[in-house]
Amino acid sequence: TTEIYTLSLHDALPIYKEFEEFRRLFDSSLQSSNSLLSEVLSYIKQRNGKMMRPILALLIAKLFGEINDSTLHAALSLELLHTASLVHDDVVDESDKRRGQSSVNAIYNNKVSVLVGDYMLATSLKHSAMTREITIVDLVACLGQNLSEGEIIQLANINASEFSEEVYYDVIRKKTAALFTASAEAGAISVHASDEMVKNARLFGEMIGIAFQIKDDIFDYYSSDEIGKPTGNDMREGKLTLPALYVLNMFDDEEMRKLALRIRALDASDEDIARFIEYTKVKREIGRAHV
């Protein structure tokens, strides 16, 4: 009964057939005659995520018109760029886990990870050109710049003594939100939506992206195998997210501020991080971040 229900639900989705076509295109784009490259790309394919960004691009395109080849190549270009950025991020963050599984750099090494990420970036640009929409090509290029700039801002903030919510929002607008913004905008552009529709799609994508990142950051305060990352993982990488920033700015606790600075400097133990998480929970600032 469950299987029948699932199939009928899938068939009812407005972009089910187009998404299946996208998945085939995605899989075929991650192939190579080189054995090592093919092996790494296959591993990346096996652990891909929920693909919310291409789904958003397809839904927006369907809302304003009919999904076409330009839409599919735009969605693929953005998903490849997103995936490449994750491969590179794991190298920068020295992370050995991604989506609950071993990261590419943990299985292979940093050199292979960087080169495979570069290969995917080049493939992303290729598919942006296949949209035959110069606006989408420019969109993808600007997205790449934003992702890099967001990562640099985040790295530069590690040594900051202030706990700025403004910097936090600046980072997520240039990283997570930028991906959702570009996906929604590309979907609208691919079906030649009006300027007003493109503008609305862009704003909608940004709001979805910001909300998604805040929710993802909140997950870091709770343990769950389904989330795909251990509790306090962001803090182990020196990142203080919105709940932490709220509690640091709301309460004048010198001991916790010093601990937060040690977390940023990667000088905190697992026990320190667990203590800071518990402090944030007690102060109920996670609930404020939910709102």
Regions found by a protein language model. Give the residues of each.
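Extracellular/surface recognition and adhesion modules
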Residues: 1-4, 291
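All-alpha prenyltransferase/terpene-synthase fold signal
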Residues: 8-290
